[in-house]
C-alpha cells in the first residue's frame, strides 16, 4: 500500500549491543543479511513490515524509515519536484528496489517498491 511505512533501519556502533537492546525490549529476533556492504541484521514485524540493525555510517544517528511506493522511479522523481533530493534506485535481489532520499529539510528517508523479479547484484 503506497505511503505505508514498511522498513526502518537503526544504525549502531555496536550492533551486538543494539540487537540485545531491541531484542529484549520488543522480542525481535535478528538474522544477518548476507551480501550487504555493511553489517546488517534484519527482523520482521509482520508479513510486510520489518527493520534492521546496521553498522553505523560515520556520525549518522537516528533511524531511517522506508515507505512503500507503487513505482519507485515515479516517486523518486516526485521527491525532487517537491524540493527534496532523490537517490538512485538499487535492487535487492528477489525482493524489490530501494532509494535513499532527503526531504525538503534534509531528513533522510527511503522509498521501497516490492518486486520479486528484482535482479541480482
Q: Where are these predicted regions, by residue range?
A:
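Conserved short beta-strand elements that form part of the metal-binding/catalytic scaffold
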Residues: 28-62, 108-114
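Catalytic core of tubulin tyrosine ligase-like
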Residues: 22
Amino acid at each position: 500500500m503506497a505511503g505505508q511505512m514498511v522498513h526502518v533501519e537503526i544504525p549502531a556502533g555496536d550492533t551486538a549491543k543494539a540487537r540485545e537492546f531491541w531484542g529484549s525490549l520488543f522480542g525481535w529476533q535478528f538474522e544477518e543479511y548476507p551480501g550487504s556492504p555493511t553489517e546488517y541484521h534484519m527482523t520482521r514485524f509482520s508479513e510486510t513490515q520489518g527493520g534492521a540493525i546496521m553498522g553505523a555510517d560515520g556520525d549518522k544517528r537516528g533511524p531511517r524509515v522506508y515507505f512503500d511506493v507503487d513505482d519507485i522511479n515515479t516517486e523518486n522523481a516526485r521527491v525532487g519536484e517537491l524540493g527534496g533530493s532523490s537517490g538512485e534506485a538499487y535492487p535487492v535481489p528477489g525482493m524489490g528496489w530501494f532509494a535513499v532520499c532527503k526531504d525538503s529539510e534534509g531528513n533522510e528517508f527511503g522509498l521501497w517498491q516490492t518486486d520479486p523479479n528484482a535482479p541480482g547484484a
